[in-house]
Regions:
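Bacterial N-terminal signal peptides that target proteins for export
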Residues: 1-14
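Extracytoplasmic copper-binding redox domains, predominantly the cupredoxin/blue-copper superfamily
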Residues: 27-230
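C-terminal segment of classical bacterial N-terminal signal peptides
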Residues: 18-27
């Protein structure tokens, strides 16, 4: 009996020690900061220099419509895998388009695909991160899909080949879709040097390095360039 009691005591002590280590590794409020910034999309345009007969066209930059900024996701690229809470998001099928075309969710989240059109749609994906086929369903119906792995999932309609959307799935909470002005906020980011990425569904991504410190938000801005048309 004494031997059994000692074993129980040893196991209990080990469990308490392990719990203490786990608690100690959880970041406190003092170990967290935030990242704020703005995303713009620069479109190359051609402008005339001067009014001379010999004036030549020169490249310039204009900003894309604000609606395009809703197709951007900003995230901490080197973020550690972290326990996350599943979300519920929605991509509607409207006028033979996915609305919105881009959503960002945590692992385990469900994305619903309501059909607002007076025709059938068939949502599917062949992405490695998540392969699925929701089958055909009519107006007024909705079908959902759980996304259980991190990564990029390209979504299409099997009936209308011009329809496409993207689901970005993260195993950490440090990501955001900018608002219509391009502004974003990433709260609760661990302190230190990080790689911050701005991703656009068609323009790809760009990454900058940023140090997050306590006491004040770290700020960063992105301008995503659109390739010039020949």
């Amino acid at each position: 009996m004494i031997s059994g009691a000692r074993s129980t005591t040893v196991l209990l002590a080990a469990a308490v020690a392990a719990l203490a280590v786990l608690i100690d590794t959880e970041p406190s409020a003092q170990d967290l900061g935030s990242v704020r910034g703005r995303v713009s999309i620069g479109i190359p345009v051609t402008a005339k220099r001067g009014t001379s007969t010999y004036s030549r066209s020169v490249p310039n930059m204009a900003l894309a419509p604000e609606s395009e900024l809703r197709h951007v996701v900003v995230y901490v690229k080197d973020a550690p895998k972290t326990a996350v809470t599943p979300m519920r998001a929605e991509i509607r099928q409207r006028n033979e388009n996915f609305v919105p075309r881009v959503v960002a969710v945590t692992v385990g989240s469900t994305v619903d695909f309501p059909n607002d059109d007076p025709i059938y749609h068939n949502v599917f994906s062949l992405s490695r991160t998540k392969t699925f086929d929701l089958g055909r369903f009519p107006q007024g119906k909705s079908r959902g899909q759980v996304f259980d792995k991190p990564g990029v999932v390209k979504v299409f309609c099997q009936i209308h080949s011009h329809m496409s959307a993207t689901v970005m799935v993260f195993d950490h909470p440090w990501f955001a879709v900018p608002d219509e002005s391009g502004t974003f906020d990433l709260p609760g980011v661990p302190l230190g040097l990080h790689q911050i990425t701005a991703w656009h569904e068609r323009l790809g991504d760009t990454t900058q390095q940023l140090r997050v410190e306590t006491g004040r938000p770290a700020t960063i801005d992105f301008v995503l360039p659109v390739p010039a048309q020949p």
